[in-house]
């Protein structure tokens, strides 16, 4: 087939824009062929662009050349057409298409390019493995659901820029090549050719730079910024990701929260037409853990924790009494009305499930009309059983699922059990968007791997004022001026008020196990800057990918990122990372010490 050019042909409309009000209008459309079907003496071609689809009609009785050319059109051919918009007859209206009231009667057709048969259908909800989709990502991105996701992402960032600009924020870019200050996830390192033996790090966040901007007097800053973390991937993690980042001077927590509730209210209304209620619930960290076993609770459903430690602390069942005696707890959830759906097989499966989270197993009591179904009631007295039933408000049809262990194990295991039960029994209302703030976090958490306290958020978080005196003596009891914004059980953003005094910052580093010299080696630039009139300041950063993922109703952030990585941190379309020339390594003063055989290199190149 001979291909043509646009020449003097100029597009007048996008495919998805047309409707009955355009009747008799002459239009020029361009896009991809989605379908081609013949009915009598008419060819019907569905034309697609990013705005949607429209039906084209080619009639052999009016222009045989154009009609014959249309017969050879195949899926994903790129074409341009000129024609007239006609209203469909009532019986031919397609109510499933936004453009279903009209069709375009084509008088001129230009075939701009052909296409091989794609490896998967270019349509919504395809059943294709992710590796194939990502290898041919340029085709995957043509699919309507992916294009909707990308357009939603664009809307969110556009609304963010408008909102923060209107609220006095300046958009300022911070460096991509910065200093490695390892504390938390691993850095991606970039070797310096000019200063051999030295490395830049790609930023895990713009944290220190945005604090410097507050020192510099810019008052309110924001940025849509790429960040990098060399860590193991999950469904909602990528090695490179996007933050909507902000920092403010001379503010308290209420001011930061109010500004961000205003932003979320605006973005949901303008991007999705959804009204969300503000202010959001604020829940202290300890309350979140005691009620849900999580610092990012999903509040779209119940199944809240019930502490039955007092009811069983003296019982004959050593799993329970021993847990309480050793400083742990016994907690449960009441799965109301679903006891008859929890067979012994399902209960055993759930018991195995919690072992993933270091629990030794799960106990249960299923309340039936005239009896109890349980593997533990034989170890409990009637009074203890009645106390449990009373505390859990259990009635026939309910199932009480119980975990006993150290508190951190109980929180983790029962919290994940709560989510698993909700998923299995469809207890989650996916139409809801439930926001809340989690506040009053611990400043530190203990790392058994490192045998020291590490920062719960980051080492620049300001302690609660009345807890500062405990930094050296009771670090486990120091609270942070920190806050996370939670949506449907996912942390979509987090922030804090920052330390703005060099002496307090040095005390913080000491509590984290840094010597004076180590602290100044890594962060001396910040503590030096604090000597020159630092204002009180604080901020917040959203995980933009995760926020858009939830808004779009996707299961993975890969579906809202144009060119994501897979779990091996590979990008399958361009096949990165890749080997580089020996000459490039020599220029950097780098020698590869890990042997790579030719077969492995060839396989990597052909992934």
Where are these regions (language model features)?
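Class II aminoacyl-tRNA synthetase catalytic cores and aaRS-like
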Residues: 1-607
């Amino acid at each position: 087939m001979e291909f043509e050019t646009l020449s003097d042909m100029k597009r007048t409309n996008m495919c998805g824009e047309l409707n009955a009000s355009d009747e008799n209008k002459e239009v020029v459309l361009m896009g991809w062929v989605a379908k081609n079907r013949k009915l009598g003496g008419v060819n019907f071609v569905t034309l697609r662009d990013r705005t949607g689809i429209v039906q084209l009609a080619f009639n052999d009785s009016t222009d045989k050349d154009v009609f014959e050319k249309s017969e050879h059109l195949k899926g994903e051919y790129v074409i341009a057409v000129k024609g007239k918009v006609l209203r469909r007859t009532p019986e031919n209206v397609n109510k499933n298409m936004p453009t279903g009231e009209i069709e375009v009667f084509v008088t001129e057709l230009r075939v701009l390019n052909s296409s091989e048969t794609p490896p998967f259908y270019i349509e919504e909800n395809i059943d294709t493995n992710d590796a194939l989709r990502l290898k041919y990502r340029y085709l995957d991105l043509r699919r309507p659901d992916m294009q909707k996701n990308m357009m939603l992402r664009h809307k969110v960032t556009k609304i963010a820029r408008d909102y923060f600009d209107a609220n006095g924020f300046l958009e300022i870019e911070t460096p991509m090549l910065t200093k490695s200050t390892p504390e938390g996830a691993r850095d991606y390192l970039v070797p310096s050719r000019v200063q051999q033996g030295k490395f830049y790090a790609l930023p895990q966040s713009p944290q220190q730079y945005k604090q410097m901007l507050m020192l510099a007097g810019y008052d309110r800053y924001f940025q849509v910024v790429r960040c990098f973390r060399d860590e193991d991937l999950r469904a909602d993690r990528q090695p490179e990701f996007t933050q909507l980042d902000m920092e403010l001077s001379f503010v308290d927590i209420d001011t930061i929260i109010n500004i961000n509730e205003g932003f979320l209210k605006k973005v949901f209304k303008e991007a999705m037409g959804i009204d969300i209620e503000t202010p959001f619930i604020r829940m202290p960290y300890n309350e979140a853990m005691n009620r849900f076993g999580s610092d990012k609770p999903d509040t779209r459903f119940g199944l809240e924790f019930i502490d039955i430690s007092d009811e069983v602390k003296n019982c004959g069942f050593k799993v329970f009494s021993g847990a309480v005696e050793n400083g742990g707890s016994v907690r449960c959830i009441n799965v109301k009305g679903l006891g008859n759906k929890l067979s012994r097989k399902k209960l055993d499966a759930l018991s195995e499930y919690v072992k993933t989270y270091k629990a030794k197993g799960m106990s249960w009591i299923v309340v039936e009309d005239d009896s109890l179904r349980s593997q533990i009631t034989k170890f409990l007295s009637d009074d203890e059983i009645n106390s449990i039933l009373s505390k859990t408000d259990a009635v026939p049809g309910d199932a009480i699922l119980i975990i006993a262990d150290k508190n951190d194990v109980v929180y983790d295991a029962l919290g994940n059990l709560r989510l698993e039960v909700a998923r299995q029994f469809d207890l989650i209302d996916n139409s809801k968007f439930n926001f809340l703030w989690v506040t009053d976090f611990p400043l530190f958490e203990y790392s058994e791997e490192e045998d020291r306290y590490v920062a719960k958020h980051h080492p620049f978080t300001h302690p609660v004022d009345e807890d500062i005196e405990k930094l050296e003596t009771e670090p486990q009891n120091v609270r942070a001026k920190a806050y996370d914004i939670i949506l449907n059980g996912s942390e979509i953003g987090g922030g804090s008020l920052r330390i703005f005094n060099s002496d307090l910052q040095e005390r913080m580093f000491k509590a984290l196990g840094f010597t004076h010299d180590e602290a100044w080696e890594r962060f001396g630039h910040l503590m030096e800057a604090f000597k020159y009139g630092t204002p009180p300041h604080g901020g917040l950063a959203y995980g933009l990918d995760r926020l858009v993922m939830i808004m779009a109703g996707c299961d993975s952030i890969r579906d809202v990122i144009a060119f994501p990585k897979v779990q091996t941190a590979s990008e399958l379309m361009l096949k990165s990372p890749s080997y580089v020339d020996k000459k490039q390594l020599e220029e950097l003063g780098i020698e590869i010490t890990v042997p790579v055989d030719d077969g492995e290199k060839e396989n990597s190149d052909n992934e």
